[in-house]
Each structure stands twice: as structure tokens, then as C-alpha cells.
Amino acid sequence: MALKLDVKAPGGKVEGSIELPAELFDAPANIALMHQVVTAQRAAARQGTHSTKTRGDVSGGGRKPYRQKGTGRARQGSTRAPQFTGGGVVHGPKPRDYSQRTPKKMIAAALRGALSDRARNGRIHAITELVSGQTPSTKSAKAFLGALTERKQVLVVIGRSDEAGAKSVRNLPGVHILAPDQLNTYDVLRADDVVFSVEALRAYIAANTGTPEEVSA
């Protein structure tokens, strides 16, 4: 069964409604799948440029520190062995690729589950635009988002062409901005509420179902 959302304008007035397809916003939430996808996404974000030097990489240490016998001490062959200060590191990190291969269908299913969880709990909102006109206003955008939800972490999904909206909220703490084609499981789960502009919501629905939703008055 399709869910229906009221579409609100910056002044708080309801400008109509839009239906959320059940296949995208009322899908079962597979927690294990979402965990796997989020883990892979965060792993792929790691640079993996960490590097340590082994005893073979550290400069110096070619000379035997003292003779083999007669000192009463344990025999040593190099001052760059790991037990010495300034020596090499044993089993230290080396540059590597942390990315994991995740099938596209799993990524899409995890995102559907995350959005469905938010939708079932009334945490998805639809708006016409963040600010009226083409002039950015952080004050107006903050007041509008505050009227939509009292929760701190908000994901705002708007079209790439909405520069006024992006500039209005980009400095607000707890607010993260994405384009509809950037929508991902991690950011949806990290946010308490997800706010879609009608343009972005229609673009996401069209890209994943092939049938854009119309806003009804």
C-alpha cells in the first residue's frame, strides 16, 4: 500500500500531497543487509595510505652493535631490530585497499529498507523548496526545518540545481545535503529525519521505478 505525504511550502502551508511507492518506501528492513552495506561503504571511504617501516626499511643498523660473545648480554645483530628504539615495526600497517565488492542489488535493497524504516515511523518529509525565491536564507531554512522536525540530525535531499537551498542549509549543524542520485543507506540511517524536495523525490522515484509521481493538490 502506497504511503501519502503532505507537501509543505516554506511558510508551513500544505501545497498538496505525493504518494510514496510501496516498493521503495514500504519494503522490509533487513538489518543484516543494511549493516553489511554500511560497513562496505565506510570501508571504501578509508584512504588506506597508512604505512610503517620494517627493519629492512629503516635506515642504518648495518653494523653489529657489539660482539657476539663475552659480554653477558643477549646476542644482537642490528640496532634496527624491533626491540630497539628506532627499530622497525613488526606487522605494522601497509598501504592497502579496504573497499569491498557489494552487488548493486544489495545496495539498492538496503537503501529501500532504510527509507522504508524512516517512512513507517513518520520521519520522511516532502517540501516544495527550502527557501522562497532564489535568495539563500539560512535563518528561513533553519526555521522551516525546525517546524518540520525537532530532531537534530536531518538529511536534506534536493536537486542539484537548487543552489539557493543548498547554500541556505550547508552551514547548519546536524544538516547533511545530498542530491537524489547520491542517496545511500549510511546517510539515511545516520539521519533522524529525511527531508525531500518534490523535485528530488520525483527524481529518485523515477530512477528506481521508471514512473515519476505527480503531486496532487
Swiss-Prot record:
SUPFAM superfamilies named among the record's database cross-references: Ribosomal protein L4
Keyword Ribonucleoprotein: yes
Region feature Disordered, mapped onto this chain: 42-100
InterPro entries linked: Ribosomal_uL4 (IPR002136), Ribosomal_uL4-like (IPR013005), Ribosomal_uL4_dom_sf (IPR023574)
Keywords: Ribonucleoprotein, Ribosomal protein, RNA-binding, rRNA-binding
Top-level taxon of the source organism: Bacteria
BP GO terms, sorted: translation
Pfam families from the UniProt entry: Ribosomal_L4
Transmembrane portions of the chain: none
One GO MF term attached to the UniProt entry: rRNA binding
GO cellular component, one term: ribonucleoprotein complex
Signal peptide: none
Chain's role: One of the primary rRNA binding proteins, this protein initially binds near the 5'-end of the 23S rRNA. It is important during the early stages of 50S assembly. It makes multiple contacts with different domains of the 23S rRNA in the assembled 50S subunit and ribosome. Forms part of the polypeptide exit tunnel.
Record note on quaternary structure: Part of the 50S ribosomal subunit.
Database matches in NCBIfam families: rplD_bact
Family recorded in the similarity comment: Belongs to the universal ribosomal protein uL4 family.
PANTHER family named among the record's database cross-references: 50S RIBOSOMAL PROTEIN L4, LARGE RIBOSOMAL SUBUNIT PROTEIN UL4M
UniProt-recorded name of the protein: Large ribosomal subunit protein uL4
Source taxonomy: Bacteria, Bacillati, Actinomycetota, Actinomycetes, Mycobacteriales
